[in-house]
């Protein structure tokens, strides 16, 4: 900030309506849009959203506005909100301003970056079609993740969304020596607390930075929490790392934007959303990308209001996704975890030119077998297995083996299941499913394929079953 700006950089509050604060400055010192200004009395940060004329700036409070009154002094910072970045953020829980909320003292770093920055330039982007191996069989087979891609995670309560996220964080941390950033956007405080303790127990907390804009916080906090997490992820990417970024829940990002838009008096658009919905979503999503230096792969939990996929918020999100992972309650009820639906889930990466002809053929063969089994289930329920043709009986047997082999014991769930977790390479996954579809394991019982990692484990389990 210039010396002239420092001299007259103090204004005073002229109006407070909930989280919307109007501040008057001298005419030559009106803060810029997106600049952070600070209330001297309680150190509350306000982000400027509009200039109303006559030296008055309107902003959104990044914290509770209780206790504010007209006349309080407000100081310009001359810059947008900035947050700590780098290794010091790992293992810490921070709020939207990058302030620690875990009681472990300040974040020990001098490195800070502004949360508002442009997306990487076109010539900086990497046109990579590389697949990110997760070690989770069902994901690697039917909906492979692209390095630097965006994945939508659809799932209701209790189907294993959080456990799947934690396993991905663990696998990236251990197998790829990578870091993760978790942004809780409009997150329930209880969920955030559970997530923190579960990751501590799993031993991966030191590989992840957590940013929470909790559900009970003002809309400004929830609107910017995603950008705070993304800024931390971008720093790691620019160091040459492959980063995994989780956003839970991406739906609450435009929802917070809707609240801010209404508070600022903007004309609502379809279904009451802000008129700038697509632009705001684009500003966040376009920054989540691969450059020639490193990559950010994001997994975003998507809530679909009233299961209406045409709602403007999920519809806008869909435009940015490379893959959709659908967690199904019906599959969870069968005791198959991860409860990922291999017929509903989709990835743009599942293309023979990207993953190779063999991977593509094996994945499609598995889906074809499962689809036929789904069609036959009504007949089986009414008439029983005996009424099926020999070919269909064989197909059903293979489909049930595929379905069970898609389950996998997780490292982060070892505490609950008592089974050691497994990381299965993509090569091993393709080899195993190819053999099951080809009928090489028709002689084995289907129980042998349930909750095992590699096919060798299934063979060993089958031997135990025969002996016992």
From Swiss-Prot:
Catalytic reaction equation(s): ATP + H2O + 4 H(+)(in) = ADP + phosphate + 5 H(+)(out)
Matching PROSITE patterns: ATPASE_ALPHA_BETA (PS00152)
Cited SUPFAM superfamilies: C-terminal domain of alpha and beta subunits of F1 ATP synthase, N-terminal domain of alpha and beta subunits of F1 ATP synthase, P-loop containing nucleoside triphosphate hydrolases
Membrane topology: Peripheral membrane protein
One term under GO cellular component: proton-transporting ATP synthase complex
Keyword Repeat applies: no
Main location: membrane
SMART domains (UniProt xref): AAA
Residues that bind ATP: 155-162
Transmembrane segments: none
EC number(s) reported in the record: 7.1.2.2
Cellular localisation: Cell inner membrane
Keyword Isomerase (UniProt): no
Molecular function, one GO term: ATP hydrolysis activity
Listed InterPro entries: AAA+_ATPase, ATP-synt_VA_C, ATP_synth_F1_bsu, ATPase_a/bsu_AS, ATPase_alpha/beta_chains, ATPase_F1/V1/A1_a/bsu_N, ATPase_F1/V1/A1_a/bsu_N_sf, ATPase_F1/V1/A1_a/bsu_nucl-bd
Keywords noted in UniProt: ATP synthesis, ATP-binding, Cell inner membrane, Cell membrane, CF(1), Hydrogen ion transport, Ion transport, Membrane, Nucleotide-binding, Translocase, Transport
Pfam families: ATP-synt_ab (PF00006), ATP-synt_ab_N (PF02874), ATP-synt_VA_C (PF22919)
Annotated function: Produces ATP from ADP in the presence of a proton gradient across the membrane. The catalytic sites are hosted primarily by the beta subunits.
Similarity section: Belongs to the ATPase alpha/beta chains family.
Assembly behavior: F-type ATPases have 2 components, CF(1) - the catalytic core - and CF(0) - the membrane proton channel. CF(1) has five subunits: alpha(3), beta(3), gamma(1), delta(1), epsilon(1). CF(0) has three main subunits: a(1), b(2) and c(9-12). The alpha and beta chains form an alternating ring which encloses part of the gamma chain. CF(1) is attached to CF(0) by a central stalk formed by the gamma and epsilon chains, while a peripheral stalk is formed by the delta and b chains.
Name this polypeptide is given: ATP synthase subunit beta
Originating species: Acidithiobacillus ferridurans
